[in-house]
Every structure is written in structure tokens, then in C-alpha cells.
A protein has these predicted regions:
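Transmembrane-helix signature of polytopic, membrane-embedded enzymes
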Residues: 136-153
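Membrane-interfacial loop-to-transmembrane alpha-helix junctions, especially the N-terminal start
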Residues: 41-48, 222, 295-307, 352-360
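TM-lumen/periplasm interface segments of multi-pass membrane proteins
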Residues: 1-5, 29-125, 336, 370-374
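Signature aromatic-anchored transmembrane alpha helix within multi-pass, membrane-resident enzymes
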Residues: 226-227, 347-369
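Transmembrane-helix motifs of polytopic, lipid-linked glycan transferases
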Residues: 123-139
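Membrane-interface transmembrane helices that cradle and orient dolichyl/undecaprenyl
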Residues: 174-187
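Membrane-water interface signatures at transmembrane helix termini and the short loops
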Residues: 162-169, 174, 199, 287-345
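Alpha-helical transmembrane segments and terminal signal-anchor/GPI-anchor hydrophobic tails
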Residues: 70-78, 85, 90, 105, ...
């Protein structure tokens, strides 16, 4: 609510502190497990559900008219909602975006007639959290709570919650679509992908990667696509940036690829080795798990393929300013791809449970480092 606006700068700290406590608690539990015990254990959902309910209410009802910048585009969404509520019209940005993100704006227009802006943001938070939670639970019921903890501990979780609302909801719905594809419910998976693109057209990329990974699921092809994308990007990356900008399926994405100015700062086009290193972590783990340890199943291959095929497209455009916005279209499933093999396969010959606990801690530690550096 607006009376909490003076406390806006502490909202991220509250999120970080609570997730830190949850992560450290799970770390201390898993770290004590003998060898492969983490694989056979079921994890309690109760604490996670309490956090998710708190997050939906507290952050869904966040101050929306503050200009402090702590909540990204929240103010833009709020002003658009206000125009709909008071005058029944969109602003210019909304009028442009409704052509592609049609479902999001249909829901926004309907909600503007029956609720205030804070309830609408809380509804959008439900649309973000619930599909992700349901997807994690369907993918791996025994370890679903830990999969979700990996998700909420990733650096993009909070950003999708308060800034990239449409994109976050779309990606969350794709996670649920992945889970249904694993269960061979192809019709519902396709419907959910269609719904996801209605929230944000860029969801076409991970949706296409999902269906591609179902039909082209051999690991060697995934690695060939990803490594090939790196080679092509290194060789002719600048030309690819220009080509993708001209051919982009999303006008906003094309603008991002061409934009050289960000918040008053002139940035350079360069190969983002830092982003690539981050993206490679679940891929390196997959290489070791699949090719060295010979451990995988159809669920893991579908998760890995969705991530690697989508990430390969980003690698092709890696030199572009704001290429991280394309990377998010694969990074949203990164935590699940990272956690799934650790919780289901005997990946490490020694101290598997302890190493899994350390990876959980390091995963959230990376989020902490980015926050401190930011």
C-alpha cells in the first residue's frame, strides 16, 4: 500500500533475508545427509507455502506510485491501469503493446472495472507464483519444494515479480507447460504456451524450445546447437545482431537489440563472457551427468533441451545491448535445470548430498553478490 512508500528501499532486503533463512536452513539439513540421501528424501512444502502466501500479499500490495525506482516498471503498469480505470483508454505504450500482449491487456482492462490497482497487482503476483509452484511440484513432487527454493533464490525471481511483470508471468506459465509436457498432456501444454504468448509475445522462444526439445531430445544435438551458436556468434555476431533486429518476432526485442543507450549511459557491443559463464553452469553439470556419469531420464532431457535451445538463440545475439533480456527467456528455467539432476541422480561419487547443499548455497550466494554489487 502507498503508506509503505517510504520503506520501498527495504523491500528487497526483506525478500533476501527471508530467502536467506530458508536457504541456510535447507543447506544445514542437506549438508548433514549421508552420500545420496538427498535423492530419497521428500521435502516439506509447508514453510515454502507460508513464504509464497506472504510474498503474494506483501509484494502484491507494494507501493505502486512511488518514483524511487525500487520497483522497476510498477509505476508504468499502475498509470496504465489508472487510465483504464478512469478513462477506459491505454497510454501510447499500452496501445502498442496490446497488439502482441493481448491477453495481458484484456485482463487488465477487465480488472480495471472491478478492482483497484493494488488488488490487480496481487492478482498478477498470483499469476506469476502459482504456475511456477505447480510446475515444480508436477516436475518432481518429492523434491518440488527444493526446486521452488532454487527458483525463488535466483536473481531473476524478484525482478520478474516487481518489474518485468508480463514477461515473468509468461515464463512462469511456460514452466507449467513444461511440466504438462513431461506428463504427456500435449494439448494443455500447447494451450498454456498460447496463453503465455498472450501475456508476453517473447514467450514464443521458450515455447518453441520446449516443443523442439520434445522431438530433438538427444543430448549431443543440444550441445551441438549450443556450442555451434557460440562459434557462430564469435565469428559473425555483429551481422547476426542486425539480422535478428530486422527479423525479430517482437518489436520491443528488435529495439533492445539496436539500442545503444541505457538510462543515459552509452554502452558498447561486446561478447558477454560473463553472461555466458553464468549460463554454462547447468550445461557443464549436464555434460558431466549425461556423458561422464551416464545418468539421465526423459524429464531431465526435456528440461535441458528447453533451456539449451532457448539459450542458444540468446548466444547468437549475445553482443547486443540488453541481450540479457533475451537471456531471461532461458534463465527462467535455469534453477530447475540446475537442481533436477542433483536431486534425482547420483551425480557425484563422493559427498553428493554435501555438494548439492553447497550448490544450493552458491546459487543463492550469486544472487546476493549481484545485489551487493548493484
Amino acid at each position: 500500500m502507498e503508506f509503505l512508500a517510504p520503506l520501498s528501499e527495504y523491500y528487497y532486503f526483506v525478500y533476501w533475508f527471508v530467502v536467506m533463512l530458508m536457504t541456510v536452513k535447507q543447506f544445514s539439513i542437506i549438508h548433514k545427509f549421508p552420500r545420496y540421501a538427498v535423492i530419497g528424501r521428500s521435502f516439506d512444502y509447508r514453510l515454502l507455502l507460508i513464504f509464497l502466501i506472504f510474498f503474494i500479499i506483501f509484494y502484491g500490495l507494494r507501493p505502486v506510485y512511488t518514483d524511487t525506482g525500487y520497483f522497476g516498471d510498477t509505476g508504468v503498469y499502475a498509470r496504465t491501469f489508472g487510465l483504464l480505470q478512469n478513462y477506459g483508454v491505454f497510454n501510447m505504450q499500452g496501445a502498442d503493446d496490446i497488439k502482441s500482449d493481448w491477453l495481458f491487456y484484456i485482463i487488465q482492462r477487465f480488472c480495471a472495472e472491478i478492482m483497484d490497482v493494488h488488488l490487480w497487482f496481487m492478482l498478477m503476483m498470483c499469476c506469476y507464483i502459482i504456475p511456477m509452484y505447480k510446475g515444480c511440484k508436477l516436475i518432481d513432487k518429492k523434491h518440488g519444494a527444493l526446486l521452488m527454493l532454487f527458483c525463488i533464490g535466483s536473481f531473476q525471481f524478484y525482478t520478474f515479480s516487481v518489474n518485468g511483470v508480463r514477461n515473468g508471468i509468461a515464463c512462469s506459465i511456460v514452466i507449467l507447460a513444461v511440466a504438462l509436457m513431461i506428463k504427456k498432456n500435449f494439448l494443455m501444454a500447447a494451450i498454456l504456451c498460447f496463453i503465455a504468448t498472450g501475456f508476453h509475445k517473447s514467450a514464443l522462444l521458450p515455447a518453441a524450445a520446449l516443443f523442439l526439445s520434445y522431438y530433438v531430445r538427444k543430448p549431443k544435438y543440444m550441445f551441438m546447437a549450443w556450442l555451434g551458436a557460440i562459434g557462430v556468434s564469435l565469428a559473425v555476431g555483429s551481422q547476426i545482431d542486425a539480422m535478428l533486429s530486422a527479423m525479430s518476432y517482437d518489436e520491443r526485442l528488435a529495439e533492445n537489440l539496436q539500442n545503444d543507450d541505457a538510462d543515459g549511459m552509452i554502452l558498447e557491443h561486446r561478447f558477454r563472457w560473463d553472461f555466458l559463464l553464468y549460463s554454462s553452469m547447468p550445461i557443464l553439470l549436464a555434460w558431466y551427468t549425461i556423458f561422464k556419469r551416464k545418468l539421465y531420464n526423459n524429464t531431465y532431457l526435456l528440461l535441458l533441451g528447453t533451456y539449451m535451445y532457448a539459450n542458444s538463440v540468446w548466444v547468437l545475439a549475445i553482443r547486443a545491448i540488453f541481450s540479457n533480456r533475451i537471456a531471461y527467456l532461458s534463465w527462467f528455467i535455469y534453477p530447475i535445470v540446475l537442481a533436477y539432476p542433483l536431486l534425482n541422480f547420483e551425480v557425484f561419487k563422493k559427498n553428493h548430498s554435501k555438494k548439492t547443499a553447497l550448490i544450493l548455497l552458491a546459487h543463492f550466494g550469486f544472487t546476493t553478490i549481484l545485489w551487493l554489487l548493484g
